[in-house]
Amino acid sequence: MKTAYKQLLRHLLLLVAVLALGACSTAPVQQGDAVIEPSFSADRVLDDDLAYLSDEISDPWEGFNRSMYRFNYRFDKYVFLPVVNGYKAITPDFLEQGIHNFFLNIEDITTFINSILQLSPTKTVQTTGRFLVNTTVGLLGFIDVASRLDIPKHDEDFGQTLGYWGVGNGPFLVLPVLGPSNVRDGVGLGVDWYTLNEIRDELDMKDSEKWALTIMKGIDTRANVAFRYYETGSPFEYDWVKLLYTTKRKMDIEK
């Protein structure tokens, strides 16, 4: 755990250098819908330490990933964020928080399953307690009673479970709309989605209800993420995101 934090600190310090260089370089330029990125990459101007970006993070599909990154930027700007901003404008704060709590409560289902698969009795018991308390006393999770009772919240997914059992990252991958990932985490995302979908089927939910929940979950998730594409002012934003995502996931698995 301490090693992971030291690595993150080291990478963050390197990223400060990246951003400083970016301030003196040509940042991505937006021309209408187009985003023109500099033709050079971070590993040409930084020292050997930042070769981690290309040497340790496998990115054989970089061309596709960068194209998808730009697609996500446009989708975010012209579709996702306008919807999110409209949602936040018409939804009272207390209701918005309640909806967020509701989806966090649903996530405890996959956290419970993955805690078992990771042989973690403490996380399993605590997550079970949170889910039972919030689902009953907390009115299906709209009120986070468990946190008021100091029951810790954990976040575990199948990608972390695969990592726990020694499965490597695989190549870096930028998913449509969802953003940075890798092959292992992409598979994990699919397994977690399938698990929740099976539960919805057991509850006899209609397809329209499933889609409504999925869309609402997406809006809620984006509303709670502060990141905005191409606002770093750095020409190395793609590399920056790739490094931070990979380091964070390593920490998630090791915690």
How should these model regions be labeled?
Residues 1, 21-25:
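Long intrinsically disordered, low-complexity regulatory segments
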Residues 62, 128-132, 195-199:
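Short low-complexity stretches enriched in small and charged residues
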Residues 11-22:
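Bacterial N-terminal signal peptides
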Residues 101-180:
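Mid-length scaffold segments of soluble, non-membrane domains
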Residues 2-13:
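Bacterial N-terminal signal peptides that target proteins for export
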Residues 145-148, 161, 166-254:
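Surface-exposed interaction patches
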Residues 24-104, 108-119, 209-255:
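N-terminal targeting leaders of membrane proteins
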